[in-house]
């Protein structure tokens, strides 16, 4: 590898809004603030919501006079 052309690879801390602190290494060179992490993201915590689009489909079919398949 060429000398002097690569960014410095340093240890940083990434702090989540929930308070979780993650120590990692990066070329960013400064500490990061995260909005979500694995401890508070709804997908990983099991609090994920399913968006119901059934009403939208029925409204579309009604608007364009498409008979329902149910």
UniProtKB/Swiss-Prot annotation:
Keywords: Metal-binding, Ribonucleoprotein, Ribosomal protein, RNA-binding, rRNA-binding, Zinc. The keyword rRNA-binding applies. The keyword Aminoacyl-tRNA synthetase does not apply. One of its GO terms (molecular function) is structural constituent of ribosome. Zn(2+) binds at residues 16, 18, 37, 40. Gene3D superfamilies: Ribosomal protein L31. InterPro entries: Ribosomal_bL28/bL31-like_sf (IPR034704), Ribosomal_bL31 (IPR002150), Ribosomal_bL31_A (IPR027491), Ribosomal_bL31_sf (IPR042105). Pfam families: Ribosomal_L31 (PF01197). Transmembrane segments: none annotated. Its cofactor is Zn(2+). It comes from the Bacteria. GO terms for biological process: translation. Binds 1 zinc ion per subunit. Binds the 23S rRNA. This is Large ribosomal subunit protein bL31. It comes from Actinobacillus pleuropneumoniae serotype 5b (strain L20).
